[in-house]
Amino acid sequence: VLKFLAATPFGQTDPLFGRDIAFYVFSLPVYSLALGLIRSLIVLSLIISGTIYLLRGSLNLSTLLGKFNLNSLSEKLGGPARIATQSVAGGPPIKLIKHTNTDQKARLHIGILLAFFLATVAVGTHLSLYNLLTTQSGPVFGAAFTDANVMIPIVKISVFAYGLAALLALYYGMSGKFSPLMGAISLTVLVGLVSGIVPGVFQKLVVAPNELVRETPFIKHNIEATRKAYGLDRIEEREIAADKPITASDIAANNLTIKNVRLWDRAPLLSTFSQIQEIRTYYEFASVDNDRYTIDGEVRQIMLSPRELASESLPNKAWINERLTFTHGYGIAAGPVNQVTPEGLPVLFVKDLPPKSEVKELEVVRPEIYYGEILNDYVITKTKSKEFDYPKGEENVYTTYAGAGGVELNSPWRRLFYAFRFGSLKMLLSGDITPESRILYNRNVKERVAKVAPFLTFDRDPYVVVAEGKLYWIIDAYTTTDKYPYSQPLPLNGVAKLNYIRNSVKAVVDAYDGTVNFYQADPDDPIIKTYAKIFPKTFHPLSDMPKSLVSHLRYPEDIFSLQTAVYTTYHMDDPQIFYNKEDLWEIPAIAQEGEQQADSKASAMTPRHMIMKLPGEKKEEY
């Protein structure tokens, strides 16, 4: 409802009805919801009112059934009725209900309710016209030739029939004449039968023999809408000649590109980091992130992995260890993508505990990680118990949390509430917890941002960056809908289908105190504009993001993969070529280890970020 009230126009209209796309995304779902609620209330009122009138004898079904020549059933109901009194054995008089004619007020009430019900059916039938643009009945998604030339006229006739039936229901309530109403209802049933038979016959006899010619305009609608909805209309196609030999001048002109050629892939590097840099069994490198940093005045591509705490790997799983002592991960391992030691190991710019950095751009002064990718449990900080920071040889270094993250347990009621919420009696009874203690929960960064903005869709791969000596998580967020007319729906990450997407938001989470900030990255997206109207203090302009973080923004892999999948088909803009799938592309497959060629078991190539200078450009890009 809030989206309906704050709706932002798309500035684009559908090709069939000429309505702005915002009508389908924001308005139509609300109309359908409201109509469904109203219809449910009317049906409930009909059932309750009809039951009461029957029990009171104000509604005579026998008369109604007699109009349909159902005399035997009418006789069983007792025919006409009246109310009489009779005394039994000299006792008080007892009222006896005997069938009589329907009460005029009851009939009027039922007639009005029937009229309202049939009116909602008429409105719902009219709204179903617009659903034709977000369903598939022809060769492509959206209304096809049969829909435009057969279904739309049938639906309009149905709307007229239900509207007429609503008026005649009101007429029945006022006059008691039921036959005209039954005639109108019979007309709606007939139209329903026609709508179930005629379109299929029309499709087989008229459309199928010459489908390409008939469907060409609608294929064009689908191509144009899909390219707009997925942002493919912004793609600039260039032809790059690849038949010229590489010269020394080419190498010199692309020196930075060559310096940043990746020698390390994520999977083997993650395994290597785990072997040489986890240091303790309760630490875990969950992922390796690819980013770029300016080091000594030169852009370098860096592989970076945060060292998170894996509480399930603690040798002693006592409550005090899991909740009060071992509370956070510590530091990162990071190195260039293009260097290897003589032993075949990665060169590390940041390593060990406490983290030692060989370059000032990657120096971390606040290495504690209280919020991460695998931190799923609550912890309590600033307690009487020592809080483990990091191991130092045979000894441990301890710390006290100095951040503002979490909630202060400064009252018995608040402590009782969280003890009940997390099902922990020990939290309530522990003598280590003080009024200054803070409980930190929702520490998984993906779950954390989703709780703040559940209406956004988030990228699967949060990545950590070093900025001004601190660690931050950046999570790309998308605005999506499955209501964009004529746009082909596809699943994102194998989950729910959508047919419109924009990378409209960049979410930033402080790894130390959990502060979440959302920055509006696409000022032209109508959906994020609508959310910004609803939650004006939630989304900040991208210009407010610190420059130290802006330099680490990137094009997300999830949306790039989705756009690639769409573009394999929708690079074809000629309807005939598209219809025949004459130029369908395939995403390359990667051969498995030990195999010379990709086979059926090979996985599709995934996107990779790299630093390179494209032909015709003056400088390298990421």
Show which residues each predicted segment covers.
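Soluble extracytoplasmic regions of secretory-pathway and membrane proteins
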Residues: 1-622
